[in-house]
């Protein structure tokens, strides 16, 4: 994964739903919790003091249980929802300062959204659906169709250009939605529970296809899910929300190895750590394996390393991304990492 500078910066974003959100937010800052706020004022705390950075070229997953605020947060990134307080910077510009015309251009050209329920136009063909945003933006019809055809092929639907949504499976419909988002050539894709409505096998195929597309295109993707396995599979970085607050943000390996609190620890307790944790995080810098010891990349999972140790190797050397040896790893160190609560 090659990531660039900060693409989206969220600074102290809070959102309160109700008639007097500013006054309600002041009560929260004074110590009132979410339940008290609802009971005493009728206001709903959606988000509270969220700060995070999303870098260019990464898949950033925002996850949590129903009602945690994840869908509310992602809708701030294209201003479908306005914050009660805070700033949202896109390439260093505060999008909250945009007037109507600039916001419209931003939504058409800089961000694209993929929804859980596909949101396809049933009376239009696949290619018409994919080209729809381009034609709204004034792209000439023939050019729009040519760009749409390229994206349809990219998501594996070549040959279905003239089909209607009702003639497609759920997974195929979601591919159309993804192609429509890609056709705009937006810098950022916002995907709100995009695969949640799909059957498990189709869902896994879509997850793998998304990782492949992101690797080839280098898009910045913000992905919402309630599924921890999906978050760990897709996310270069993961943010975990609870009751509108950010509990932890980091790589999947970081969160598994060092949960920030008991809530996060419970969330990740049943995960197969060996398939997620990477050897580089547990290499011992002072350990120098024998000259003939196996050399493995830092991105090797602990599960894969354990299989190497099963062959009799007493230690392995860990190679960083720059090709240098960063340390060594022993079977005991792997066992300690896998057993850690």
Predicted regions located by residue number:
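Conserved ABC ATPase "signature" region
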Residues: 13, 27-36, 91-94, 135, ...
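Short coil-to-helix segment of the ABC ATPase nucleotide-binding domain corresponding to the Q-loop/switch region
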Residues: 124-131
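Conserved ABC ATPase signature
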Residues: 164-168, 172
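A short, proline-enriched helix->beta-strand linker immediately N-terminal to the Walker B motif
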Residues: 183-187
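Conserved ABC ATPase "signature" C-loop
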Residues: 243-244
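ABC ATPase "signature
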Residues: 249-250, 258, 328
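The conserved cystathionine-beta-synthase
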Residues: 291-314, 318-322, 329-341
